[in-house]
Amino acid sequence: MWFSKTNFPVEGKTALIVGASQGIGVNLAERLYEKNCSTILVARTESKLQHQIQNIKEKYPESSAKISYAVADVSNYDECTRLWRTIDPADPDILFCCAGSSIPKLFQDLTKVDIESGIDINYKTVINVVHTGFKHALSNNTDNLEPHNFKKRSVVLFSSVVSFFPFIGYSQYAPMKSAIESLSIILRQELSPYNYRVTCVFPGNFQSEGFEEEQKTKPDITKKIEGPSNPIPGDECARLIIDQLDKGYDSITTDFIGWFLGCSVLGISSPRQWGFFQILVSFIVSLIAPIANWFINRDIKNSFKKTKKE
């Protein structure tokens, strides 16, 4: 697949981007609009959406595409149903589910609000939008087309590298991102007969408002295990994602460490990226993982001992 770049044509298409008031959602909107792909930005705050649309139009005045927005809290199922009815004439070809938020804390420090927002923002926003969108497509099949005659659509879900390697500090976030990976596998099986392509993205650290917020609550032990981080620019992250989609990959990482960690959890149903090399790396990881895990657990125990003394 790596030599082909014709698997994700966007010119003349319409993309619905959920979680597009900031971060990677905006970066993707810019990339797509630049490629003459009409975009519909979705988020909860209208003023932010209006601001982003104005910036994108000013940045790419040559684009012939349309850009608009829809205000919706997609963690609410009924609002998702309303969303699809509102944008019905557009009938998006591509759906990006980018909404997400991490609040890194020790489990004992999480609040009820933290836990509920983790479920709402990181999981319900995805399953609600995809489910209502698919049901909407089925209800619009007034010509009684056979599943294989449905128009081609793409669904791109955003998980995280922490779904490959969950560790201390991410209990509010990582389990939901693992759920997104599982959901992508099931959707690929259930929606592909209807001409849906389902892709799961596992981004590493990239520059965004969310990344800056994470640093405010991230425990020291989490930072130590994570190691020094040099987040890539958000627009570079978006470029990599679209490039990998174009090459036909349906399991996408945005940096080497993400690809490496993904090798440790190849599984049965997950699509692969440079699969032969992943098998080799997976074998190596299986040998060194117990050693690495011993050091991680040692550091965690020492961290709690230090905290107790203080």
Curated annotation (Swiss-Prot):
Name the catalytic site residues.
S159 (proton donor), Y173 (proton acceptor), K177 (lowers pka of active site tyr)
Q: Where does NADPH bind?
A: G19, S21, G23, R44, K48, D73
- What positions does the record give for the motif labelled GXSXG? 19-23
Q: Which residues cross the membrane?
A: 276-296
Top-level enzyme category: oxidoreductase
Entry's localization field: Endoplasmic reticulum membrane
Name the chemical reaction catalysed here: sphinganine + NADP(+) = 3-oxosphinganine + NADPH + H(+)
Q: What happens when the gene is disrupted?
A: Leads to an accumulation of 3-oxosphinganine in cells, and decreases levels of inositolphosphorylceramides. Sensitive to the IPC synthase inhibitor AUR. Abolishes filamentous growth and impairs pseudohyphae formation. Not essential for cell viability.
Q: Which InterPro entries match?
A: KDSR-like, NAD(P)-bd_dom_sf, SDR_fam
**Which pathway does the protein contribute to?**
Lipid metabolism; sphingolipid metabolism
Q: What does the entry give for GO biological process?
A: 3-keto-sphinganine metabolic process; sphingolipid biosynthetic process
In terms of PANTHER family, this protein maps to:
3-KETODIHYDROSPHINGOSINE REDUCTASE
Please state which protein family the record places this protein in: Belongs to the short-chain dehydrogenases/reductases (SDR) family.
In UniProt terms, what function does this protein have?
A: Catalyzes the reduction of 3'-oxosphinganine (3-ketodihydrosphingosine/KDS) to sphinganine (dihydrosphingosine/DHS), the second step of de novo sphingolipid biosynthesis.
Q: What is this protein called?
A: 3-ketodihydrosphingosine reductase TSC10
**The gene coding this protein:** KSR1
